[in-house]
Swiss-Prot record:
This is LL-diaminopimelate aminotransferase 1. Transmembrane segments: none annotated. GO terms for biological process: lysine biosynthetic process via diaminopimelate, diaminopimelate-aminotransferase pathway. It comes from Trichormus variabilis (strain ATCC 29413 / PCC 7937) (Anabaena variabilis). Its EC number is 2.6.1.83.
C-alpha cells in the first residue's frame, strides 16, 4: 500500500483561517439574518488599479493575435518586469539588487514554503512568536520539527517571543540558529523594524553563517522615512538574506497572483562536503524544474504598477487601507482597549479585555456584534490574549464594525 508523509499528521486539525471560516459559516447558518463584517483574513477588498486592469486587457488582446501571442514564458519572470522592480523598488532606495536576482512567482506564501526545498533537513530554525502560521506549518510538513506540545509549540523550532515588553520585536537569540524568519512590517502584530534592529540581525547572521528569510509583503505600508523597506538597505544583507515581496497588498493582487523573491548571487550556504554553494543557482534550478512561471497577462498587470499612473493608484490604495487602520486604532483605543500596530502596517494588534482568551474573544465578538477578527493564539502561544484586526475592508464596513464594537460590545 502507498504511504503518506506522516509529518502532515503533526499539524493541528485545521489551518488557522479555515478554522475561522468554519466557525463563521456555522454562525451564519444558525443566524441567516446577521450581517457579518469580516476583519479577519488579510484579503483586500478594493478593485485593481486602473493602470493594471488596462495593461492586462491589452495583454489579453495580444494573446488573441498570432503575431503577439505568448506561450511559455521564462520561469524567472520576464526581464522587463524584473528590471522595473530592481530599479524602482530596490535601487531607488540604495539597495543593491540586480534584475537577474529577482524571481517572479505566484505568491510570497508559496515562496516562503518552497524555499525550504533548497535547504537541508538539519538546520536549526528560528521563528518569532506570534508568527505567520505558514512559516511553521511548512517546516512541519518538510519534517523539520518534532511534535507539538500543549501550547502548540513544535519540538525542534526556536521560538522568539515578541511582546508588548519588547515592543513586539524579537531579541537576538543567545544560541546559534541557521534559518531565521523575519517579517516587517509584521504580520500579525503590525510592528516595524528600524535599520539598527535589522543591522543587529544581519550582524548575527554573518557571525553564525545563518540565513534570514525576510518577508516584506507589507513594505508599501511604511510611511515613516526612517524605516527600511528592504533588508538589502542594510549593510552586509546580501551575504545573509533572501527577501520575499508581493503585489497582493499594495496593488490588490490577492486574486490575480504575482509576487517576487530576491536571491542575491553573493548568498551561499554549505553543502554536505563542506563546500560553499550559491543559493541563486539552487533556487533557479528549483524554479525551472517545479514552476512554469507567472502568466504573461498577470506580469503585464504587475509591470503597470511601476508606471506613473500605477504608482499614484497604488499609493491611493495603500493610503485607503492605512486610513482604515487609523480608524480602527482610534476607535478601539477610545473604547479602552490596549492597541498596537496599525501605523506603517495594515494590521491592528489588540489585547483582549478582562482576561478573555483569544478564541473566547473571537466568539464573543462574532456572537454579540457579528464582527470577525483573528485570534492571536492562532499565530502562536505568545499570541494568546491578543486579537488581530485587519484594515482590509471597505470604509463603510470598517466604520460600522467599529461603531458596533464601541456602542454594543461590553468590554
Amino acid at each position: 500500500m502507498a504511504t503518506i508523509n506522516d509529518n502532515y499528521l503533526k499539524l493541528k486539525a485545521g489551518y488557522l483561517f479555515p478554522e475561522i471560516a468554519r466557525r463563521v459559516n456555522a454562525f451564519a447558518e444558525a443566524n441567516p439574518d446577521a450581517k457579518i463584517i469580516r476583519l479577519g483574513i488579510g484579503d483586500v477588498t478594493e478593485p485593481l488599479p486602473e493602470a493594471c486592469r488596462t495593461a492586462m486587457i491589452q495583454a489579453v488582446e495580444e494573446m488573441g493575435d498570432r503575431s503577439s501571442f505568448k506561450g511559455y514564458g521564462p520561469e524567472q519572470g520576464y526581464a522587463w518586469l524584473r528590471e522595473k522592480i530592481a530599479t524602482q523598488d530596490f535601487q531607488a532606495r540604495g539597495a543593491d539588487v540586480d534584475a537577474s536576482e529577482i524571481f517572479i512567482s505566484d505568491g510570497s506564501k508559496c515562496d516562503t514554503g518552497n524555499i525550504l526545498d533548497i535547504f537541508g533537513d538539519n538546520n536549526i530554525i528560528a521563528v518569532t512568536d506570534p508568527v505567520y502560521p505558514v512559516y511553521v506549518d511548512t517546516n512541519v510538513m518538510a519534517g523539520h520539527t518534532g511534535v507539538a506540545n500543549d501550547k502548540g509549540e513544535f519540538e525542534g523550532l526556536v521560538y522568539l517571543p515578541v511582546t508588548a515588553e519588547n515592543n513586539f520585536t524579537a531579541e537576538i537569540p543567545s544560541q546559534k540558529v541557521d534559518l531565521i524568519y523575519l517579517c516587517f512590517p509584521n504580520n500579525p502584530t503590525g510592528a516595524t523594524a528600524t535599520k539598527e534592529h535589522l543591522q543587529a540581525w544581519v550582524d548575527y547572521a554573518k557571525a553564525h553563517n545563518s540565513i534570514i528569510f525576510f518577508d516584506a509583503a507589507y513594505e508599501s505600508y511604511i510611511t515613516d522615512p526612517s524605516l527600511p523597506h528592504s533588508i538589502y538597505e542594510i549593510e552586509g544583507a546580501r551575504e545573509v538574506a533572501i527577501e520575499f515581496r508581493s503585489f497582493s497588498k499594495n496593488a490588490g493582487f490577492t486574486g490575480t497572483r504575482c509576487a517576487l523573491t530576491v536571491v542575491p548571487k553573493t548568498l551561499k550556504a554549505k553543502a554536505a562536503d563542506g563546500s560553499d554553494v550559491e543559493l541563486w543557482k539552487l533556487w533557479n534550478r528549483r524554479q525551472s524544474t517545479k514552476f512554469n512561471g507567472v502568466s504573461y497577462i498577470v506580469q503585464r498587470g504587475a509591470e503597470a504598477v511601476y508606471s506613473e499612473a500605477g504608482q499614484a493608484q497604488v499609493k491611493a490604495l495603500v493610503s485607503f487601507y492605512l486610513d482604515n487602520a487609523k480608524i480602527i486604532r482610534e476607535k478601539l483605543t477610545a473604547a479602552g482597549l490596549s492597541v498596537y500596530g496599525g501605523v506603517n502596517a495594515p494590521y491592528v494588534w489588540v489585547k483582549t479585555p478582562n482576561g478573555l482568551s483569544s478564541w473566547d474573544f473571537f466568539d464573543k465578538l462574532l456572537q454579540t456584534v457579528n464582527v470577525v477578527g483573528t485570534p492571536g493564539s492562532g499565530f502562536g502561544a505568545a499570541g494568546e490574549g491578543y486579537f488581530r484586526i485587519s484594515a482590509f475592508n471597505s470604509r463603510e464596513n470598517v466604520e460600522e464594525a467599529m461603531q458596533r464594537i464601541t456602542e454594543k460590545f461590553k468590554l
